[in-house]
Amino acid sequence: MENRICTLAKPLPKLDESKQAWVSYLWLKKALPGFEEHSAYVYMTTNPTIAGRIFLPINNEDLEDGTVEISGYDNLLADALYISTIAPVKLDFVQLIVIDDNSQDQDAIIERIKGRNAILMESDFINQNILVQVCQPVRHGVVDSETKFVIERKDSFTFLASNEKNISSFKRGKTETDAELVIRPSKVHTEIQWCLQNCSLIHVPFELLFNVGKKNGCPISLRLSDGKNVYGIASIKSDTEHDSVQLSPSLHYFDEFNESVISEEGTEAFLVARGPSVGIASRISLRTIPTQSCFSEKLLKAANLCVVQQVKQKVFLQSKQIFCVPINSLMANSDSVDILELTRNTDAYIWYSVEEIDPLNTYNIYYTNEDTSIVLDTQLSHRLLPSLRKPLLNFVKVHPPSQKLLRFCRAFFDPQQVPGFNPFFLLHGNPFTGKTKAVEEVASLFSAPVFTISSYEFADATADHLEAKLDMFVQNVVKSPCAIIFVKDLDVLSISSDEGNIVPGSKSIQILLSKIDLVKSPQGRYIVIGTCHSIEKIPYEILSESFFELKFSELEMDERLELLKIYANNVIIDKRISLKDVALKTNSMSFGELECLPDHMTKAAVDRIKRTGYDNDSIILSGPIITEQDVDVSINRIRKEKSNTIFTVPKVNWDDIGGLEEAKTVLRDTLQLPLQFPELFSQGLKPRSGVLLYGPPGTGKTLLAKAVATELSLEFVSIKGPELLNMYVGESEANVRNVFEKARNSSPCVIFFDELDSIAPHRGNSSDSGNVMDRVVSQLLAELDSISKDNNKYVFVIGATNRPDLLDPSLLRPGRFDKLVYLGINKSEESKASMLRALTKTFKLDETIDLNEIAKNCHPNFTGADMYALCSDAVLSAIKRKTNEIDLLIQASGTDLSTEEFFKRNENQDSLELRITKEDFLTSLKKLRPSISEQELHRYEMVRHQFS
């Protein structure tokens, strides 16, 4: 939206019962190119990066140029408004909630709204009796004559009082008395809230500020119950409770130990009618707080350049205050001096503390200007980093390995604990499972800077170069009183022999461990955290140093749900969509993929609405609503882009399988119930985890397993028995473990063992010298038992075999393959016709063909594979017939055209269309014989009776 033309205006509050804006059209025409009276819709926001409002403003030529009057929208009463033209999206559907009042006729309500081409927004009140519940396809658009309305009547709005502004409170006007309130802590503290532009803000409801005679942007004072005062700059925030305020996190901490001035539950205070004393700062002294970023010469140089310029642009500061400067590390490392480039797309932060402000102790709060002298002290500050509350912290608290790390770090960084013990944690797991995210989130909570080094940086380095690099790294670490030393990718340091064993004695490892030992001083609090993909590849020298090993697996459903709640917080999802259903569809997705999923969904929604004729800007400003279709498109797009997919879901539906209705019902009941109603199994009831499909070959066992995965949106892994076997001792069992481990990580998942009898025969009967088959069966039994005990991992195992009598009997005991489903031959004509319909649904059949009649002519012993062969032969027969017809046409034309040239010239003619006729099927039937004889079928029936 960078090309959208905007103009700035000063907003003024207007006491009016309506929700509207007034502006001088004459001024707006001059100030805003593209503004026309006949289409006078405009978009207003206090900041181009946050959502605003669409208005059809009322013309008031008496208003001063550059001003806008606003009523009913306190969140727009800021220092300035950005105004731009917009073509609002027309609403297709609106659902209203109306208080049940007989005097309000439903049709009259709709006509009144349609008649004035109202602009509606989800969760807005049209008046005290009507709430806009749902809008489609955007949350903020214009009504026209074609908009469909649905009205739901209710007895009352119990929440009306807290949502609607009471205009009588504004009419009381300015008072000179203090206002009682509660200071609420913010749920999230991110680096952006600590920037210079935000570090002194106090977020106040408009009516509270108005009633003490203050304006947005003016200095205010809060007096706490213990007599202390907090000073800051008023910032109107409409979603704040009417009797509470929120402080910028920078205003919480003013002492060396970062003790917050407010409690977690909230602190009672007064908004003092008399404001604080304010003066110009003649000189400000700043020190950097030790973090890894500040030890980068180029990053620090770029940050110092930015902080000098930003401080000179009138910011409000107090002594002992902390703030940060965001920096684009790529631009900083390229020695750029362009402030705009350095502060755009930032990914690094340099923290500063205000040491002194001159004139000393003269004012409560100071503001800066171009004449303010800024001193950047080269000595590091003794202050600790502030405690951040990043959005992912809620996820950390429900993610078991992150939760353990959080608990250990809380105990270690407790100031009441005596320092001296420096633990070593080893985090291991597949890539993109959240190891780095967990460390960053936990560290931010405990004010501990993270000093990161990757093993790739010194894997091939010489001993001298490595020692020099690590010496500098350690020197920077010890400058901070507490820190986390984060060593990534430790398995890079391992050296393997030809037999696959880890060779000890790597020089790099010895140097690394010796340097880490230098950090472990009795005075400091330092935690060492290492990461790796596989703990089996870690040298024993490192394993002997680690105190705790935490395994990071693929995200489970409830963990993905918590992440989606965080990442999807800033997008608009259709209220009919459950995030739990979305989480079910995102199995095996990583942190990064879930983080970018909301952006993909928004793009899909914009693309969908854009096809109706609106431009990108209008759609985005109107708030596109994400539908289920957008969710599916986005998930499929991410899966296609994913290069390391573990398993894929096959595209086989129930409709693709003819017959087998009994088997379908059993599988649906067995597998679908624990997925849809997990609460049924929360009281100790164990869901069935194993199903064995047995019967003659060609009856659809593999196809049925694929359909289960597709219909229930499960990951699917198909294992042919011999694939697991390996010539080396222990490798076959390891292969079995790996299959189940990956399935657990990708739950809900289906493991399909085809030809199960080839890897799980009777134990004791194998002729191999190492008893490999017996060990594989034992490992398989252990894995089946483990998944049946874990209610939180939805892993279903489906086995398929022609000979269940050859299987080890232990596999068929309760808790393993305890449900046996026989897939026999569909002898009924109705079942065979159903199979034919499923197999030929993509064919172009002759209009006169009757599949029921074809089914009558089929042999009773035809299996599903035989029916597939019948259809394939019928297609080949049709192709031969059509080829002969074309040859005759070429001969009749008297030309020397080849068959290919003839097709090119006549490709659009209906006469070339290939249609399957009854004769094609009958020709194929004459040649086809059942693949299973009567004797074999009799033997399978005996096996069925044995296991039924």
Swiss-Prot record:
GO biological process: protein import into peroxisome matrix; protein unfolding
Keyword ATP-binding listed: yes
Ranges that cross the membrane: none
Predominant subcellular localization, coarse grouping: cytoplasm
Organism: Schizosaccharomyces pombe (strain 972 / ATCC 24843) (Fission yeast)
Xref: SMART domains: AAA
Functional description taken from the UniProt entry: Component of the PEX1-PEX6 AAA ATPase complex, a protein dislocase complex that mediates the ATP-dependent extraction of the PEX5 receptor from peroxisomal membranes, an essential step for PEX5 recycling. Specifically recognizes PEX5 monoubiquitinated at 'Cys-6', and pulls it out of the peroxisome lumen through the PEX2-PEX10-PEX12 retrotranslocation channel. Extraction by the PEX1-PEX6 AAA ATPase complex is accompanied by unfolding of the TPR repeats and release of bound cargo from PEX5.
Any GO CC annotation of this UniProt entry: nucleus
Subunit details: Interacts with PEX1; forming the PEX1-PEX6 AAA ATPase complex, which is composed of a heterohexamer formed by a trimer of PEX1-PEX6 dimers.
Domain of life, source organism: Eukaryota
Family (UniProt): Belongs to the AAA ATPase family.
Alphabetical keyword list: ATP-binding, Cytoplasm, Hydrolase, Membrane, Nucleotide-binding, Peroxisome, Peroxisome biogenesis
PROSITE patterns attached to this UniProt entry: AAA
Membrane topology type: Peripheral membrane protein
Location(s), subcellular: Cytoplasm, Cytosol; Peroxisome membrane
Reactions catalysed, as given in the entry: ATP + H2O = ADP + phosphate + H(+)
GO MF annotation list: ATP binding; ATP hydrolysis activity
Annotated residues for binding of ATP: G695, P696, P697, G698, T699, G700, K701, T702
Name of the protein described by the UniProt record: Peroxisomal ATPase pex6
Enzyme Commission no: 3.6.4.-
